[in-house]
């Protein structure tokens, strides 16, 4: 039986996934702007591309359909309605200011789709706009700015496709991102899901979010979201995802009978543990890898459908987070593999995404090669670790889990 579109678990057989290869946006990273763009360092882009293609090849070797975001966006831009939808939003007054649309829209609209997709993800500097297009408002802006400043900012964090949208069972969220450097990513991902033929012909729900709305204090990122199965969704609440957004997702899921409970992992906000999946991820049906110093401090909040005005009840569960997750799945407990090494090595490996692995099927995960101690412990626990190189890809603080947006994943029987 064919699995319907959606992420029905965290470890079932992965069927279909979206990734985004490092390209022009990463060539725009410099020592002076990388922190603002949420990277810790600049990348050797050619090497990052080589390693990312190796990652993709290893997934395809196992029969996984891998979609690349630049390619999907290019195919959306081949469609007149899709191209207009994207340009309307990328050139809106809130995105570029009044008057700019009139100066640059025709130039962008005349581009081949693959070139336009590259610029929409990679950014457009003022100096790249042809001289004959620098009229009116844009001409004044170029004199006020350096030619190397960006009219359309680059989006290097598209590399981490997990975050901008998240599939939860048979639907998807369009996520309002926490930091300005990432907020425009959701526009492009939304365009793909609403206009690309491979999605237009399939039946799925939109649980939450709108690329055009001002969500205020409601922020949500996919690295915090785990549809683990048995009607249970885990969501981290730390640096990136807020109670305001989490509760709206819960209400939507419960109102449509799509979930039976949500376990919110309340975490201290910290860059090293920006998302739940940086400290906790599933490797097998009953096995997780975790960073104990953070996971031990999680306060689990359990949300369940109710007749209350909000549409749900909430209670604090005093048990350890892993015990709450296990009982939600109908298990007596979870096997755990902690970040490897002594206290110093464990900190290093967590920072280098040792716990941020993505399951290709039960008991098979992709992880970074540099996390030797954690990978050895996973292997000892019976997990096959498919290693990919970390030296360049990891500079944005994201591993295999972050770099994949599962679109179709099999359920697991709990």
From Swiss-Prot:
Reaction(s) the record says it catalyses: L-arginine + H2O = L-citrulline + NH4(+)
Known EC number: 3.5.3.6
KW Cytoplasm (keyword) present: yes
Superkingdom per UniProt: Bacteria
This protein's UniProt keywords: Arginine metabolism, Cytoplasm, Hydrolase
InterPro entries xref list: Arg_deiminase
Pathway where it operates: Amino-acid degradation; L-arginine degradation via ADI pathway; carbamoyl phosphate from L-arginine: step 1/2
GO function terms (MF aspect): arginine deiminase activity
GO CC terms in record: cytoplasm
Compartments in which it is found: Cytoplasm
Listed PANTHER family: ARGININE DEIMINASE
Family from the record: Belongs to the arginine deiminase family.
Name assigned to this protein: Arginine deiminase
């Amino acid at each position: 039986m064919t699995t319907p579109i959606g992420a029905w678990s965290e470890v079932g057989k992965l069927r279909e996934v979206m990734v985004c290869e490092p390209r022009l946006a990463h060539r725009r990273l410099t020592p002076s702007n990388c922190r603002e763009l949420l990277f810790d360092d600049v990348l050797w882009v050619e090497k990052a591309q080589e390693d990312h293609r190796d990652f993709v090849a290893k997934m395809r070797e196992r029969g996984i359909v891998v979609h690349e975001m630049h390619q999907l966006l290019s195919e959306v831009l081949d469609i007149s309605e899709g191209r207009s939808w994207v340009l309307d939003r990328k050139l809106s007054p809130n995105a570029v200011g009044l008057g700019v649309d009139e100066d640059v829209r025709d130039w962008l609209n005349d581009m081949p789709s693959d070139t336009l997709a590259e610029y929409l993800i990679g950014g457009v500097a003022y100096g790249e706009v042809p001289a004959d297009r620098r009229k009116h408002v844009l001409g004044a802006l170029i004199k006020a700015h350096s030619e190397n400043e960006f009219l359309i900012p680059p989006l290097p964090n598209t590399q981490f496709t997990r975050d901008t949208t998240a599939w939860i069972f048979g639907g998807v969220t369009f996520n309002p991102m926490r930091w300005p450097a990432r907020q425009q990513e959701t526009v492009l991902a939304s365009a793909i899901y609403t206009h690309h033929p491979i999605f237009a012909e399939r039946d799925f729900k939109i649980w939450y979010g709108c690329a055009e709305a001002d969500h205020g204090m409601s922020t949500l990122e996919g690295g915090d979201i785990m549809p683990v199965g048995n009607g249970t969704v885990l969501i981290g609440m730390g640096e990136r995802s807020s109670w305001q957004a989490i509760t709206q997702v819960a209400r939507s899921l419960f109102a449509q009978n799509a979930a039976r409970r949500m376990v919110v992992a309340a975490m201290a906000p910290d860059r090293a543990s920006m998302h739940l999946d940086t400290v906790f991820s599933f490797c097998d049906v009953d096995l997780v890898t975790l960073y104990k110093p953070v996971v031990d401090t999680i306060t689990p909040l359990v949300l369940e459908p109710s007749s209350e005005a909000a549409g749900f009840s909430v209670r604090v569960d005093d048990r350890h987070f892993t015990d709450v997750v296990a009982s939600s799945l109908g298990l007596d407990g979870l096997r755990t593999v902690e970040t490897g090494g002594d206290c110093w090595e464990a900190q290093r490996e967590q920072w280098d995404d040792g716990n941020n692995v993505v399951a290709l099927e039960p008991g098979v995960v992709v992880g970074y090669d540099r996390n030797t101690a954690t990978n050895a412990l996973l292997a000892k626990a019976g997990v096959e670790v498919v290693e990919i190189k970390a030296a360049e890809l990891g500079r944005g603080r994201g591993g295999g889990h972050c770099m994949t947006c599962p679109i179709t994943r099999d359920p697991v029987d709990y």
